[in-house]
Amino acid sequence: MAFLSLSSGDVTGFKVLFALLILYGLVSYLVHSVIHMKFIAPLGVNAPLDRFSEARAIEHVRVLAEQIGGRQEGSPGLRQAAVYIRTQLEQIKERAGSNIRIEIEETVVNGSFNMMFLGQSISLTYRNHTNILMRISSVDSQDSDPSVLLNGHFDTPPGSPGAASLLELARLTIDSGWTPPRPIIFLFNGAEELFMLYYGLQDDGLGSHGFMTTNRWRDTIGAFINVEASGTGGFDLVCQSGPGSWPSYTYSQSAVYPMATSAAQDVFGAIPGDTDYRMFANDYGDIPGLDIIFLLGGYFYHTSSDTVERLLPGSMQARGDNLFSLMKAFASSTKLLTAQQRESFGAAASGSKGESPVFFDYFAQFLVCRYLGLLLKKASPGVSQYSICDISPYASFIVLEKWEFILYL
């Protein structure tokens, strides 16, 4: 009988291979846990009122998706959803303290605009679209103060995590006892996906166009967060940011569960789809902001299988915690400016538009955020130790051997 004979080199090779397999398994498990939000415990309906609760947000989803059902433009369900959202906002207003001013508006918008789709220019005209707004501010604030906009649309097919997240977030803004240093505007727009229903992936953004062309607060918006969903949950990815570097930097400093990569912004440009981000940041506002989107489970997106039960546990909890922290960071920032102020200050208002932000998260634990611009200069003699240090909120440097690399944010 012949026996397999292994040399010492073969044994070492097998050990290395076995170690690599274990490492691969651990990394795969970690990545799967992060993508599916396994490390986040969603809070229930009885959670403290000063915390965002996924269970409370899902209650809104069930009303919108199951009790009301289809909410396509022109359907009775869309009007029922508007009534429900307005009712919830009025209830939130009743609980506000004496130091808070709340204004609720329901507006009907009309308009027209051109858009590019698959290389072709298309003209769209719309009438009688409903937008619902809630503006939360301190009693001593002015109408002209720069504000933060959070946008979500409620005209989706079954499932509406965007609008539901904002309802719970509006409640949290009041019940947390926080007094916003700058006004916060929640926009529930009722016409974002009309064009997509007929032509595939492209979204048209009629409601956001109506806001940007007619609303009295449009020129006060200093930053915005657009909440979207192209799936049933998972990591809440920042797929677009800008103009300038300020939005991505603010996200890197404030997100509780940072989930972002600058590569997503490059890929998104190649997809025949769009969001309300275009109306705010590019076509009509030039407003600094973020486009945040659910991606996992995209094969259920806009199908009959896009149900409440398919929402991944922990996804909306992570979204709510991130949005509340990010909203407070934007509202407290000195870079929050009105349209007139941005025009006066130019590129310095939110970071140069020529800057190219490069960022990525590390398993949703922290975000590495840097901006292109490299200066190389000679270090002092005798410096040989490798070190990484922060010298300002906008720069970091690496000292390696006798060369000092300064990477400007």
How would you name each of these model-derived features?
Residues M1-L6, K353-Q365, S392-A395:
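Membrane-proximal N-terminal segments immediately preceding the first transmembrane helix
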Residues A2, F14, A19, G190, ...:
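Short amphipathic alpha-helical "recognition" segments used for binding
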Residues A2-L4, L21-L30, P381-L409:
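Alpha-helical transmembrane segments of integral membrane proteins
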Residues S5-G44:
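Hydrophobic alpha-helical transmembrane signal-anchor segments
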Residues G9-K15, D361-S384:
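Juxtamembrane/start-of-transmembrane alpha-helix segments at the extracytoplasmic/lumenal side
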Residues T12, G77, I398-V399:
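Alpha-helix capping and helix-coil boundary motifs
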Residues P42-Y371:
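Soluble extramembrane regions of membrane proteins in the secretory/endomembrane system
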